[in-house]
């Protein structure tokens, strides 16, 4: 029998059909090659939006800088970055008037955090520009290198372990006449391989000392490295994103802490909360506007889009905001917070890897690094690239481009939200002093504007006034990309609102399926995703049950672990059948060992091992949960792990899942190819660092890693802790006399070895 698909929707309210409009199947696009072109685009565009500003030269670095602040008022609808200082300050004052004490309280909260935050806060985060090696590194390594080099240059405040003291070192480093750094370089040589007798290129890594004068050091400290943003859907062109170095990171963190504290107190802010909490907060604003628009009033909502939010923001404006917000606070606090915007006003954008040229006829490839773009003959480039390079040339110093205006992506999300909310705040009747009024929602560059007025002309006037007010602070609402609707239907940060926020379950589709970490984690993540969607995204019981069955099927095909009594033949079926036959209680076998699936929508919260534990044969239990199993390199056994799940839209989300460590929780070995490259030394450093920290935390479970003062104290601390713990355990009868004696002996041996060294 044929089913007419329209019948499926007869009883469904239209907003529930949103999940059927899902356009994103398949993998998102990734970028390949160099990001240099995209970065030049960003730099050139940013300068174009501020072109009527004043040019100055930075006295320290010699970089030309464009300052659009208090520039000409716009005469057309083109996007521009000419924010007016007095307008921004006035918006801040009104925001404080409507929320008495908000800035004062947030400052006090932040001050407390500033004094308590430890340096290891900066090890969070992914790739970081490492100024010592002039390329990206994992955050922990970049921080370690920075502290190491500071120390060898006599800057040791950070040894206290407080972030604020590390920042003191950063400030002092900028006053130094020169900094001595250690950089890596590689030598290549041709050698004959003993096994294959072929010639191979062997790379060795060397370290060398290098002196940077004040100018070169400042340029590096102010540099943001750029990369191409990956996995962006619905865009034809890629775009560049920035990773700042360690000098900037700490200062940005404190500014964002203050701004986050303010955002938490603003009902129009979509940050820093997320998920259901965010939906509830936003629904309140909509409810307020709809209840207040009595029968006589009209209410319309704009689903807003801003043109190039980051490129029209200005760090100098943020400095003005911070100066105002912290005006009654102690001097040291105001100074710490104003450094981030000052550094951003003097920032340099690193152009990335440069361009790759290849000659088809001669089979030659050559890389033109970004440093050469300043003086290379342009005849080799196509017209488009020629124009870009010509435009950017006046701004280049050492392969980096001076970029004073603009903010780069994702740097001050919270603070720019405060600016956006301050304009929404001006929509109250006591400020508009007319019949129309507005309110709305702001989350970084995304906004929704709700305007109420007695008639259509009033609505139009309200929108126009909002548009023009935004222009005064460097926010450019795009008239082409924003659309207006009767209040009750709009979109904000990929949440669709229609008489309430609609659960758009299809957005989560990419995160269903097998993650490919290992058998244990994948099972746990799979059922957790289904559970979370039942809680948060209106995934109904019947659909969830079906999703579960599809997941189990997918899982069995991925790991070739079909049930022991199946007819399907795979590489593993011989072994699994054997296990099936010799197992007494077959229900106790894990799905990954060819067992049956015992999950249903009621028990998704229980890890599979726990679900089946009572059903398992004893010898199976012993094999499954055996920490001495030689085939498993065990991860740290924690009760909760974090998985990264990819929704269709927006950033990757971190999701917790229960981790029960079994012999199925294996970790694949690292790819060996890295061991032959220049990265090898860094990799070894990093592993050593990791091992030391892990060991230290075993002794002091709650410790956050502090760099010990003087090299010996870390080991000494662990030895003395081991002795104390052993004595307590011995006296309470937890360990035997022989074990106690052995521990004491090991401790003495360690001390002896240290003395000899």
Swiss-Prot record:
**Sequence ranges assigned to domain RdRp catalytic in this UniProt record:** 286-483
**Region (Disordered) location:** 52-82
Region Promoter-binding site, as annotated, extends over 249-256
Tell me the keywords, alphabetical order: Eukaryotic host gene expression shutoff by virus, Eukaryotic host transcription shutoff by virus, Host cytoplasm, Host gene expression shutoff by virus, Host nucleus, Host-virus interaction, Inhibition of host RNA polymerase II by virus, Nucleotide-binding, Nucleotidyltransferase, Phosphoprotein, RNA-directed RNA polymerase, Transferase, Viral RNA replication, Viral transcription
Positions of short motif Nuclear localization signal: 187-195, 203-216
Where is this protein localized, as stated in its record?
A: Host nucleus; Host cytoplasm
Can you state which reaction this protein catalyses? Answer: RNA(n) + a ribonucleoside 5'-triphosphate = RNA(n+1) + diphosphate
Q: What PTM annotation applies here?
A: Phosphorylated by host PRKCA.
Q: Name one GO cellular component term.
A: host cell nucleus
Q: What is its main location?
A: host cell
The reply on keyword Cell membrane is no
Q: Name one GO molecular function term.
A: nucleotide binding
The keyword Phosphoprotein appears for this protein: yes
Pfam families noted in UniProt? Flu_PB1
So which domain of life are we looking at?
Viruses
The protein's matches in InterPro entries, at most eight in alphabetical order, are given as: RNA-dir_pol_NSvirus (IPR007099), RNA_pol_PB1_influenza (IPR001407)
* A single GO BP: symbiont-mediated suppression of host mRNA transcription via inhibition of RNA polymerase II activity
**Might you give the EC number(s) for this enzyme?**
2.7.7.48
**Compositional bias (Polar residues) at which positions?**
55-64
Chain's role: RNA-dependent RNA polymerase which is responsible for replication and transcription of virus RNA segments. The transcription of viral mRNAs occurs by a unique mechanism called cap-snatching. 5' methylated caps of cellular mRNAs are cleaved after 10-13 nucleotides by PA. In turn, these short capped RNAs are used as primers by PB1 for transcription of viral mRNAs. During virus replication, PB1 initiates RNA synthesis and copy vRNA into complementary RNA (cRNA) which in turn serves as a template for the production of more vRNAs.
Name the family the entry cites: Belongs to the influenza viruses polymerase PB1 family.
Subunit structure, interactors included = Influenza RNA polymerase is composed of three subunits: PB1, PB2 and PA. Interacts (via N-terminus) with PA (via C-terminus). Interacts (via C-terminus) with PB2 (via N-terminus); this interaction is essential for transcription initiation.
What protein name applies here?
RNA-directed RNA polymerase catalytic subunit
The species this protein belongs to is Influenza A virus (strain A/Hong Kong/212/2003 H5N1 genotype Z+)
- The gene is PB1
């Amino acid at each position: 029998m044929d089913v007419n698909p329209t019948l499926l929707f007869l009883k469904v309210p239209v907003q529930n059909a949103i999940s059927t409009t899902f356009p994103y199947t398949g993998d998102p696009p990734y970028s390949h090659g160099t990001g240099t072109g995209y970065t030049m685009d960003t730099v050139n565009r940013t300068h174009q939006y501020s072109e009527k500003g004043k040019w100055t030269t930075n006295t320290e670095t010699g970089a030309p800088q464009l300052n659009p602040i208090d520039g000409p008022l716009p005469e057309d609808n083109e996007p521009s970055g000419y924010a007016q200082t007095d307008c921004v300050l006035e918006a801040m004052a009104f925001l404080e008037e409507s929320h008495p004490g908000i800035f004062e309280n947030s400052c006090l909260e932040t001050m407390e955090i500033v004094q308590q935050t430890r340096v290891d806060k900066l090890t969070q985060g992914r790739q970081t520009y490492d100024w010592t090696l002039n390329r990206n590194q994992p955050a922990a390594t970049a921080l370690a290198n920075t502290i190491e080099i500071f120390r060898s240059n006599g800057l040791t405040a950070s040894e206290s372990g407080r972030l604020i003291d590390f920042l003191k070192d950063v400030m002092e480093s900028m006053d130094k006449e020169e900094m001595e750094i250690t950089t890596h370089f590689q030598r290549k040589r041709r050698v004959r391989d003993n096994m294959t007798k072929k010639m191979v290129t062997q790379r060795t890594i060397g370290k060398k000392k290098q002196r940077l004068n004040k100018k070169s050091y400042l340029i590096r400290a102010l540099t943001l490295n750029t990369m191409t943003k990956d996995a962006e859907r619905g865009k034809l062109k890629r775009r560049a994103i920035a990773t700042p170095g360690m000098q900037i990171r700490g200062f940005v963190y404190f500014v964002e802490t203050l701004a986050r504290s303010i955002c938490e107190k603003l009902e129009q802010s979509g940050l820093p909360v997320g998920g259901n909490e965010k939906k509830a907060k936003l629904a309140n604003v909509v409810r307020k506007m709809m209840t207040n628009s009595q029968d006589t009033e009209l209410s319309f909502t704009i689903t807003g889009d801003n043109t190039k939010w980051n490129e029209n923001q200005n760090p100098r404006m943020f400095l003005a905001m911070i100066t105002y917000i912290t005006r009654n606070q102690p001097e040291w606090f105001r100074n710490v917070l104003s450094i981030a915007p000052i550094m951003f006003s003097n920032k340099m954008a690193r152009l990335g890897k440069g361009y790759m040229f290849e000659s088809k006829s001669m089979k030659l490839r050559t890389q033109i690094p970004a440093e050469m773009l300043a003086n290379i003959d342009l005849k080799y480039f196509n017209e488009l690239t020629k124009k870009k390079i010509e435009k950017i040339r006046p701004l280049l110093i050492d392969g980096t481009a001076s970029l004073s205006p603009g903010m780069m992506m994702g740097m001050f999300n919270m603070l720019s939200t405060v600016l956006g909310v301050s304009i929404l705040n001006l929509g109250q009747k006591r400020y508009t002093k007319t019949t129309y009024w507005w309110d709305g929602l702001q989350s970084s560059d995304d906004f929704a504007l709700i305007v109420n007025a007695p008639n259509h002309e009033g609505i139009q006037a309200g929108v126009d006034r909002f548009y023009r007010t935004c222009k005064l602070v460097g926010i450019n609402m795009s008239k082409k990309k924003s659309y207006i609707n009767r209040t009750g239907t709009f979109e904000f940060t990929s949440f669709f609102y229609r008489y309430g926020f609609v659960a758009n379950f299809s957005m989560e589709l990419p995160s269903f399926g097998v993650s490919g970490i290992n058998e244990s984690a994948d099972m746990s993540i799979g059922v957790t995703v289904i559970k979370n969607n039942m809680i948060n995204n209106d995934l109904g019981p019947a659909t969830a049950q079906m999703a579960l069955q599809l997941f189990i099927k997918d899982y069995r095909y991925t790991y070739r672990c079909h049930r022991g009594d199946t007819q399907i033949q795979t590489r593993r079926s011989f072994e699994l059948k054997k296990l099936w036959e010799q197992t007494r209680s077959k229900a106790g076998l894990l799905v990954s060992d060819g067992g049956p699936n015992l999950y249903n929508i009621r028990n998704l919260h229980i890890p599979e091992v726990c679900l089946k534990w009572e059903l398992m044969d004893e010898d199976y239990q012993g094999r499954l949960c055996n920490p001495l199993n030689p085939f498993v390199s065990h991860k740290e056994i924690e009760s909760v792990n974090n998985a990264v799940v990819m929704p269709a839209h927006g950033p990757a989300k971190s999701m917790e899942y229960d981790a029960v460590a079994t012999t199925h929780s294996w970790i694949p070995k690292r790819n060996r190819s890295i061991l032959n490259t220049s990265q090898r030394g860094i990799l070894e450093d990093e592993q050593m660092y990791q091992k030391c920290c892990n060991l230290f935390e075993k002794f002091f479970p709650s410790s956050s890693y502090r760099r010990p003062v003087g090299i010996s104290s870390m080991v000494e601390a662990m030895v003395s802790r081991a002795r104390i713990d052993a004595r307590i355990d011995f006296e309470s009868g937890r360990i035997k006399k022989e074990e106690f004696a052995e521990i004491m002996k090991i401790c003495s041996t360690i001390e002896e070895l240290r003395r000899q060294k």
